[in-house]
């Protein structure tokens, strides 16, 4: 409900934002930012990471924020990332989809508030998945401690790799 308040009712969220920010600052949970081109397998990778995390860390919790693009023509968003995620059920996981609410963006303008809310709630790991990005988008770096760039092997000519900014900044690249 707090994430919805941050998105839709800023006046309500403003009443609790200071407390949330204090609690979020006290939680040193890492934020894993996952980004890549549309259709590269970001949601499938998130699902696999969640599955392994839940097995390997039986006492830990994970919060997932998944951002999907809003269509320019209709303003709507499919929020379909969860279709690929089979491991998002259970008491130790929370998954929330957000729409970019604008075209040509990889993240929602409310994503940092959502991350802070999950940190304040005490999650041990937070995964932030962007919608598909273009060659010059590195916005995920502003919201994550560790960044993972996912790409397909069909990237075109080798010179295309030189144009992908995330290859210069990502902590991990998965093909």
Identify the residue ranges that each predicted region occupies.
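Hydrophobic anchor at the beta1->P-loop junction of P-loop NTPases
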Residues: 32-34
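Short, conserved "post-DEAD/DEAH" coupling segment immediately C-terminal to helicase motif II
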Residues: 138-139, 162-165
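Conserved beta-strand/loop subsegment of P-loop NTPase cores
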Residues: 146-151, 166-175
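Short, charged, surface-exposed secondary-structure boundary motifs
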Residues: 156-162
């Amino acid at each position: 409900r707090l994430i919805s308040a941050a998105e839709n009712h800023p006046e309500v969220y403003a009443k609790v934002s200071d407390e949330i920010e204090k609690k979020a600052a006290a939680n040193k949970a890492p934020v894993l930012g996952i980004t890549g081109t549309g259709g590269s397998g970001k949601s499938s990778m998130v699902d696999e990471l969640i599955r392994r995390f839940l097995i390997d860390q039986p006492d830990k919790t994970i919060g997932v924020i998944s951002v999907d693009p809003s269509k320019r023509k209709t303003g709507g968003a499919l929020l379909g990332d969860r279709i690929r995620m089979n491991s998002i059920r259970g008491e130790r996981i929370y998954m929330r989809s957000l729409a970019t609410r604008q075209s040509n963006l990889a993240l929602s303008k409310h994503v940092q508030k959502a991350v802070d809310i999950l940190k304040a709630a005490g999650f041990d790991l937070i995964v932030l998945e962007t919608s598909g990005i273009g060659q010059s988008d590195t916005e995920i770096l502003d919201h994550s401690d560790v960044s993972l760039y996912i790409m397909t092997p069909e990237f075109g000519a080798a010179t295309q790799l030189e144009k992908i900014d995330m290859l210069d900044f990502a902590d991990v690249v998965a093909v």
